[in-house]
């Protein structure tokens, strides 16, 4: 069984395209094209389910048409309308010394600690709706929005899923 902390969201399936089972896919990260992985993970009825990719083709820099194995008709493809799509983290450079981070969404589920303020909480969401990407960090029922900026990150421990930051005064 695939767990939420083993994947990160990369987009959403929109609607069927044509009659042969292709699905329109809006993505925030093209990791599926850059990393060798034969499947995508879909969230269906609260369960993460892998689906093998037969083929895909880009329509723009944020949309693609995806053909999944076993999905051969528009009726079958329609079942994927508005389904969230995830990518398995194990295919992303998990080596301790690797700095290859595909997207800010990768950090969802990481604990965050500040070198001056201690533990800040856990990243529960990423707001990338503006040019300034924000981490939504939750601790004790309270939410803190923190800029997701490489200059603030002092240490990354992928095994412990811990992000150490040094945030300028006034942002916390």
Swiss-Prot record:
Chain ranges of the PRC barrel domain: 99-171
GO biological process terms, semicolon-separated: ribosomal small subunit biogenesis; rRNA processing
Pfam short name (any one): PRC_RimM
Alphabetic keyword roster: Chaperone, Cytoplasm, Ribosome biogenesis, rRNA processing
Source domain of life: Bacteria
Source species of the chain: Phocaeicola vulgatus (strain ATCC 8482 / DSM 1447 / JCM 5826 / CCUG 4940 / NBRC 14291 / NCTC 11154)
Function: An accessory protein needed during the final step in the assembly of 30S ribosomal subunit, possibly for assembly of the head region. Essential for efficient processing of 16S rRNA. May be needed both before and after RbfA during the maturation of 16S rRNA. It has affinity for free ribosomal 30S subunits but not for 70S ribosomes.
Gene Ontology MF terms: ribosome binding
Family: Belongs to the RimM family.
Entry comment, domain topic: The PRC barrel domain binds ribosomal protein uS19.
Subunit structure: Binds ribosomal protein uS19.
Subcellular location field: Cytoplasm
Protein name (database record): Ribosome maturation factor RimM
PANTHER family reported for this sequence: RIBOSOME MATURATION FACTOR RIMM (PTHR33692:SF1)
HAMAP family (UniProt xref): Ribosome_mat_RimM (MF_00014)
UniProt xrefs under Gene3D superfamilies: PRC-barrel domain (2.30.30.240), RimM (2.40.30.60)
GO-annotated cellular components: cytoplasm; ribosome
SUPFAM superfamilies found in the cross-reference section: PRC-barrel domain (SSF50346), Translation proteins (SSF50447)
Gene behind this protein: rimM
